Amino acid sequence: MGFEETELRLGLPGNGGTEEVLIRKRGFSETETGHEDESATTVDLMLNLSSKEAATTAAAAADPTDKHKTLPKEKTLLPADPAKPPAKTQVVGWPPVRSFRKNMLAVQKSVGEESEKNSSPNASFVKVSMDGAPYLRKVDLKMYKSYRELSDSLGKMFSSFTFGNCESQGMKDFMNESKLNDLLNSSDYVPTYEDKDGDWMLVGDVPWEMFVESCKRLRIMKGKEAIGLGLAPRAMAKCKNRS
């Protein structure tokens, strides 16, 4: 018997023959040869890549104007004229007012203007002040028909004060300087008014219709304070000019 037949080997029974083992196993030389081939291929690929990069770098350094040509073409993919964003709506006011609310306000405004126009020729409101009284009043002169009615109404408004009455014929009494001086020297209050010219005159110096048209404001002052205003000459001159 030979040595090979009696040699102990690790393996399954029946797997005899070294030829099969040699077929399934690679030797050291084959392994080294395979590694050398792979490294050579890798080196070749790296050399090819490095050579391309070197060529590109050299071309860019030689001609700097071609730098834009080597850039990626991502920018060319963008649209040349992008669509503009939609214009924002203009905010007129805040909070917003609905259309029916606007229409209602417009109607109310027009009605108010028409009522003022219609009431203006039929009304003549003037403010009334009195020396010593801490309040003002407003009266419509066209509601009265004479100086007597106006005097009674003013007496009720300022009930805590007393002042001389101006009757419908009071104009003739004011033209008399002696009676005018007696009235001004008394302790009673005298009604005066400011006309369109800005002059202060005594109430009753002109006819009632003319007084209603020219009166802008009424003031009830003490008779002694009305002496220095020089109302009588102006009243007589204006009355003569208007008559």
UniProtKB/Swiss-Prot annotation:
Q: Return the Basic and acidic residues bias intervals.
A: 64-76
Share an example GO biological-process annotation for this protein: auxin-activated signaling pathway
The alphabetical list of record keywords is:
Auxin signaling pathway, Nucleus, Repressor, Transcription, Transcription regulation
**What is the induction comment?**
By auxin.
Q: Where is the motif (EAR-like (transcriptional repression))?
A: 8-12
- Entry's Gene3D superfamilies? Phosphatidylinositol 3-kinase Catalytic Subunit, Chain A, domain 1 (3.10.20.90)
Concerning SUPFAM superfamilies, the annotation shows:
CAD & PB1 domains
- GO CC terms in record: nucleus
Identify the stretch(es) annotated as Disordered: 54-91
InterPro entries given for it? AUX/IAA_dom, AUX_IAA, PB1-like
Positions of the PB1 domain: 123-223
Q: Where is the composition biased (Low complexity)?
A: 77-89
**Pfam families assigned:** AUX_IAA
Record bears the keyword ATP-binding: no
Its subcellular locations are: Nucleus
Please describe what this protein does.
Answer: Aux/IAA proteins are short-lived transcriptional factors that function as repressors of early auxin response genes at low auxin concentrations. Repression is thought to result from the interaction with auxin response factors (ARFs), proteins that bind to the auxin-responsive promoter element (AuxRE). Formation of heterodimers with ARF proteins may alter their ability to modulate early auxin response genes expression.
Q: How does it assemble?
A: Homodimers and heterodimers.
Which family does the record claim for this protein?
A: Belongs to the Aux/IAA family.
UniProt domain comment = The N-terminal half of the protein contains two conserved domains I and II. Domain I includes a slightly degenerated ERF-associated amphiphilic repression (EAR) motif which seems to be involved in the activity of transcriptional repression. Domain II is required for the correct degradation of the protein through the SCF-mediated ubiquitin-proteasome pathway. Interactions between Aux/IAA proteins and auxin response factors (ARFs) occur through their C-terminal dimerization domains III and IV.
Which protein is depicted?
Answer: Auxin-induced protein AUX28
- Native organism: Glycine max (Soybean)
